[in-house]
Curated annotation (Swiss-Prot):
PROSITE patterns per UniProt: BON, LYSM
Record protein name field: Uncharacterized protein DR_0888
CDD domains per record: LysM
Domain BON: 4-73, 119-188
Lineage, highest ranks first: Bacteria, Thermotogati, Deinococcota, Deinococci, Deinococcales
Organism (species): Deinococcus radiodurans (strain ATCC 13939 / DSM 20539 / JCM 16871 / CCUG 27074 / LMG 4051 / NBRC 15346 / NCIMB 9279 / VKM B-1422 / R1)
Region named Disordered: 79-105
SUPFAM superfamilies from the UniProt entry: LysM domain
InterPro entries: BON_dom (IPR007055), Lipoprotein_DolP (IPR051686), LysM_dom (IPR018392), LysM_dom_sf (IPR036779), Transpt-assoc_nodulatn_dom_bac (IPR014004)
Sequence ranges of Low complexity compositional bias: 79-93
């Protein structure tokens, strides 16, 4: 369960799938030490900017590498249309006009809505920046996704007060028309739980402490003790009662 059981790469993938332009592209995502590497193909150059904007709204993303993304169709100027030919009318009193060509401005051909979607997706990054700049919320695991001019907050906070604060900050960002906090939950100790990350993979890793049990750990991360089976299976633990202090467990999504 996000935010504790999903790697940074998986959360970036989820954000891409939630975007109507990027969802059909099937982009691949890898992450190491905060750098997200995206590979795949896009139709237009403008979608590279959209990738950066969407990934930039994900908590834990420090850098975005799009060198592995290929643009299939480069932006180009459309061919000039030829004016229909009409019979020339001669008049001895009118001089011929000069044949100097008129310099026309360059026209960049883009799909309808590409620029608007890219620009509005940048709102999510601005909201995340506002949350990161707040002393109470800076270390909370919160992702910001974009839906039109509205933002969707996903993750966890320590209290109802922080939940209201996150919504208030998001609404205060210029361009935000609505805030969805249905994916933002209150989880005691959210800040501490979010620190349990593998720096190389972004996976959640928990170090077993004296007195811990798998059911207690499952309650901590999932809010359900019976989810201990998921943790046991993911870590190849045959006997759930035999875990040792200092043992590191990966927490599956």
């Amino acid at each position: 369960m996000w935010p504790f059981g999903k790697s940074t790469a998986d959360r970036v993938k989820d954000a891409f799938k939630a975007n109507p332009v990027l969802a059909p592209l099937g982009l691949e995502v890898q992450e190491s030490r905060g750098t997200v590497k995206v590979t795949g193909e896009v139709a237009r150059q403008s979608q590279i900017g959209l990738i950066n904007a969407v990934a930039g709204g994900i908590n834990g993303v420090k850098n975005i590498d799009v060198s592995g993304v290929t643009v299939l169709q480069q932006a180009s100027a459309p061919a000039a249309q030829t004016a229909p030919t009409t019979p020339a009318q001669t008049s001895p009193s009118v001089q011929d006009s000069p044949s100097t060509p008129v310099q026309m401005p360059d026209i960049v051909q883009q799909g309808a809505g590409d620029v608007e979607i890219e620009d509005t997706s940048r709102i999510a990054k601005a909201v995340l920046s506002a949350i990161r700049g707040n002393g109470e919320l800076a270390n909370n695991p919160i992702d910001v996704l974009q839906s039109g001019n509205s933002v969707i907050l996903r993750g966890a906070v320590d209290s109802d007060h922080e939940l209201r604060l996150a919504e208030q900050l998001a609404r205060g960002v210029q361009g935000v028309s609505g805030v969805d906090i249905s994916g933002l939950r209150v989880a005691q100790g959210a800040k501490e739980l979010a620190k349990d990350k593998d720096e190389d993979t972004g996976d959640t890793v928990y170090t077993v402490k004296p007195g811990d049990s798998l059911s207690k750990i499952a309650e901590h991360y999932y809010g359900d003790q019976m989810e201990y089976k998921k943790i046991a299976h993911y870590n190849n633990i045959s006997n759930p009662d035999l875990i040792q202090p200092g043992q590191k467990l990966r927490i599956p999504g």
